[in-house]
């Protein structure tokens, strides 16, 4: 089974509408829609914005549906000169950019327990997402680190700090927490993001303007991934 998680309705609703033999289960306030797309077993959920919402959703999905793979899909802010609005980022690994125990001597982003800064994605899954994105000719697509934090990135200073600390190519608010949960449960995962803004001082203007278009593109790539998986 393929598990797909998005933070907002706009990031998952079109995929939910594609489900055949659809079943709805509500757990801890989150709706999980399961069924088939292209004869593949799929479960889809809108987790809500932020790392805690995403982690609750991912853990519940794993315990309830036992997916083979988790995909976090949606929009993000670009942290790379190679990614313009509506270009595509696929994660090779993820990092929680707002995790900070540096006063205790840890590196920025260090997660105690798993003792990692960057959580590795399943490279086979990331490569398949990349191949699907490039074959659809939906814009430039690059592989790299995707950073997550409980902040909407809206300043050049925030952007520079994340780039300097982690070399991330895109910033958002859920992927690394989903990756953290997947990693601890030994479930393959990756993150697919389409750029809705440049994570700069104008992102609050660009985001509402380009969010829908970026989300449509991520859904198209997810559908191709499901068909190819």
What are these regions (language model features)?
Residues 18, 124-139, 181, 217-228:
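Generic non-transmembrane alpha-helical segments
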Residues 60-64, 82-83, 180-188:
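Alpha-helix C-terminal capping segments
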């Amino acid at each position: 089974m393929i598990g797909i998680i998005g933070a907002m309705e706009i990031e998952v609703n079109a995929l939910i509408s594609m489900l055949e033999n659809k079943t709805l289960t509500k757990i801890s306030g989150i709706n999980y829609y399961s069924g088939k797309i292209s004869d593949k077993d799929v479960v889809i959920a809108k987790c809500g914005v932020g790392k805690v919402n995403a982690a609750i959703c991912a853990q519940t999905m794993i315990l309830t549906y036992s997916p083979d793979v988790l995909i976090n899909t949606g929009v993000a802010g670009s942290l790379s000169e190679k990614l313009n609005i509506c270009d595509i980022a696929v994660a090779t690994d993820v990092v929680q950019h707002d995790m900070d125990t540096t006063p205790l001597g840890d590196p920025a982003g260090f997660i105690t327990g798993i003792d990692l800064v960057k959580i590795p994605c399943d490279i086979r899954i990331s490569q398949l997402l990349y191949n699907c994105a490039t074959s659809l000719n939906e814009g430039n697509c690059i592989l790299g680190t995707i950073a997550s934090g409980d902040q909407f990135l809206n300043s050049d200073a925030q952007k520079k700090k994340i780039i300097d600390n982690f070399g991330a190519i895109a910033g958002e608010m859920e992927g690394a927490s989903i990756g953290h949960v997947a990693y601890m449960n030994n479930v393959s995962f990756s993150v697919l993001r389409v750029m809705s803004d440049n994570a700069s001082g104008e992102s609050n203007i660009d985001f509402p303007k380009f969010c829908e278009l970026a989300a449509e593109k991520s859904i198209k790539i997810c559908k191709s991934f499901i068909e190819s998986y």
